Amino acid sequence: MNAAGGGSGSQAAGAAGVNSSLSHNALLSTASGATTMPMAQLADGWLELESDPGLFTLLLKDFGCHDVQVEEVYDLQKPIESPYGFIFLFRWIEERRARRKIVETTAEIFVKDEEAISSIFFAQQVVPNSCATHALLSVLLNCNENNLQLGDTLSRLKAHTKGMSPENKGLAIGNTPELACAHNSHAMPQARRRLERTGAGVSSCRFTGEAFHFVSFVPINGQLFELDGLKPYPMNHGGWEDSEDWTDKFRRVMAERLGIATGEQDIRFNLMAVVPDRRIAITHKLKMLRTNQAIVSGTLQKLLKADEQGESGNGDSQRPDTPTTLLEPSAFTARDLQSLLKNLDTEIAINEQHLADENDRRHMFKVDASRRTHNYDKFICTFLSMLAHQGVLGELVSQHLLPSKKVSGQGAANRISKQSTTASAGGSTTGATASTPKTQQQQAAAAKNGKSPSKTPGRRRKGRNKCRKRK
């Protein structure tokens, strides 16, 4: 915590090193000139983001990295295809409570060598509420550029921060307008109001015990690194066996972290994987399947045509030349090719459905983002004012309050009915004795003679029996 919460003096010095040519009140603009933001709002104006894979996927696209998506991991044992890294979200107060248990372990795996630290992208979180962007950049900027297209913004950031200290890298992230604007564009309106109420400089992601925090797990040079912007150094969890994948090592680390091995599952967490865009692999597979479909279909047509010519008596007809070495006419009959073509059609239909599902997911990501970021305050206030102007607001409020009153009235009625039921049940014991035929005859005779019926005939009867016994 002390390393993450750097003082204002070190922050000013780092900011001077990163943006020495810009004044504090200057306007920063992107390379295209479309995005402008006051310098004073960059480091202090970052907003909280939700932990949502759709939000993170759209955020990566806004960063300029288009061939990547983020998926939520529900089962650690389920294999994940070609992940770039993992983002682990946990409750910061719970990590702080468990600090005594893991402080010795983390101290042993800290990488304190400056040369080793400068060779990787590790940035300390010195800007409030930027942990989500930090986690994404810790994965992307430590990946091989041959396997991932970072885009102009991230490529410039990676080149600009090469050789910087972790603190200055964190300041460089916070003072990049493209990242700040993309980050804040996915925040809910409530996050902006909270920031305005509490004032800048206080990070709920860093200091509030009820907040959550993001950290990244990424393979670097055959070692599994944990990159936490609130820690002073990166953590090296070591390598993995030659017969293993790096995700196997990650599963063991997470199992120990979450207490799954010991049964202590008391940490609320969320796990997401940064993976290649699934649509790219599906599109490539569809292209291959359609190519094979065309080859098989063409070969089948030529084979059937040759068989028809042979049946018609044309002895000079030859077997067709295949367009590929994968299919030899002597190895496949017409029935085999028809069966293979049917399987290809099925595979194509399945992958087309998968591609449509992925596109629908992307569309829903955008719909959810619009709903998440839209400010409904003006609409609600205008709608209520129109109802009040038409004179129907009070009636609607009364109608909505009536069910609660009915419920309370029903509760009182139920209590009264219970009391009456209890009273009638208590009197039913005495009434049962008085309602017997013999007792009714006695009451009728007493009424005829002008005498009041006895209230306790049972007791008098017992007394007479005792007197008779004494005699």
From Swiss-Prot:
<dbReference type="GO" id="GO:0031507">
    <property type="term" value="P:heterochromatin formation"/>
</dbReference>
<dbReference type="GO" id="GO:0006511">
    <property type="term" value="P:ubiquitin-dependent protein catabolic process"/>
</dbReference>
<comment type="similarity">
    <text>Belongs to the peptidase C12 family. BAP1 subfamily.</text>
</comment>
<dbReference type="InterPro" id="IPR041507">
    <property type="entry name" value="UCH_C"/>
</dbReference>
<keyword id="KW-0833">Ubl conjugation pathway</keyword>
<dbReference type="Pfam" id="PF18031">
    <property type="entry name" value="UCH_C"/>
</dbReference>
<feature type="region of interest" description="Positively charged C-terminal tail required for binding nucleosomes">
    <location>
        <begin position="405"/>
        <end position="471"/>
    </location>
</feature>
<comment type="subunit">
    <text>Catalytic component of the polycomb repressive deubiquitinase (PR-DUB) complex, at least composed of caly/calypso, Asx and sba (MBD5/6 homolog). The PR-DUB complex associates with nucleosomes to mediate deubiquitination of histone H2AK118ub1 substrates; the association requires the positively charged C-terminal tail of caly, probably due to direct binding of DNA. Interacts (via ULD domain) with Asx (via DEUBAD domain); the interaction produces a stable heterodimer with a composite binding site for ubiquitin.</text>
</comment>
<feature type="region of interest" description="Disordered">
    <location>
        <begin position="410"/>
        <end position="471"/>
    </location>
</feature>
<dbReference type="InterPro" id="IPR001578">
    <property type="entry name" value="Peptidase_C12_UCH"/>
</dbReference>
<dbReference type="GO" id="GO:0007385">
    <property type="term" value="P:specification of segmental identity, abdomen"/>
</dbReference>
<dbReference type="GO" id="GO:0004843">
    <property type="term" value="F:cysteine-type deubiquitinase activity"/>
</dbReference>
<protein>
    <recommendedName>
        <fullName>Ubiquitin carboxyl-terminal hydrolase calypso</fullName>
        <ecNumber>3.4.19.12</ecNumber>
    </recommendedName>
</protein>
<feature type="domain" description="ULD">
    <location>
        <begin position="375"/>
        <end position="403"/>
    </location>
</feature>
<dbReference type="GO" id="GO:0005737">
    <property type="term" value="C:cytoplasm"/>
</dbReference>
<feature type="active site" description="Nucleophile">
    <location>
        <position position="131"/>
    </location>
</feature>
<dbReference type="Pfam" id="PF01088">
    <property type="entry name" value="Peptidase_C12"/>
</dbReference>
<feature type="site" description="Important for enzyme activity">
    <location>
        <position position="228"/>
    </location>
</feature>
<feature type="compositionally biased region" description="Low complexity">
    <location>
        <begin position="420"/>
        <end position="447"/>
    </location>
</feature>
<dbReference type="GO" id="GO:0016579">
    <property type="term" value="P:protein deubiquitination"/>
</dbReference>
<keyword id="KW-0539">Nucleus</keyword>
<keyword id="KW-0156">Chromatin regulator</keyword>
<dbReference type="GO" id="GO:0040029">
    <property type="term" value="P:epigenetic regulation of gene expression"/>
</dbReference>
<dbReference type="InterPro" id="IPR036959">
    <property type="entry name" value="Peptidase_C12_UCH_sf"/>
</dbReference>
<feature type="site" description="Transition state stabilizer">
    <location>
        <position position="125"/>
    </location>
</feature>
<keyword id="KW-0645">Protease</keyword>
<dbReference type="GO" id="GO:0035517">
    <property type="term" value="C:PR-DUB complex"/>
</dbReference>
<feature type="compositionally biased region" description="Basic residues">
    <location>
        <begin position="457"/>
        <end position="471"/>
    </location>
</feature>
<dbReference type="InterPro" id="IPR038765">
    <property type="entry name" value="Papain-like_cys_pep_sf"/>
</dbReference>
<comment type="function">
    <text>Catalytic component of the polycomb repressive deubiquitinase (PR-DUB) complex, a complex that specifically mediates deubiquitination of histone H2A monoubiquitinated at 'Lys-119' (H2AK118ub1). Mediates bisymmetric organization of the PR-DUB complex and is involved in association with nucleosomes to mediate deubiquitination. Does not deubiquitinate monoubiquitinated histone H2B. Required to maintain the transcriptionally repressive state of homeotic genes throughout development. The PR-DUB complex has weak or no activity toward 'Lys-48'- and 'Lys-63'-linked polyubiquitin chains.</text>
</comment>
<keyword id="KW-0788">Thiol protease</keyword>
<feature type="active site" description="Proton donor">
    <location>
        <position position="213"/>
    </location>
</feature>
<feature type="domain" description="UCH catalytic">
    <location>
        <begin position="45"/>
        <end position="276"/>
    </location>
</feature>
<dbReference type="GO" id="GO:0003682">
    <property type="term" value="F:chromatin binding"/>
</dbReference>
<dbReference type="GO" id="GO:0000785">
    <property type="term" value="C:chromatin"/>
</dbReference>
<keyword id="KW-0378">Hydrolase</keyword>
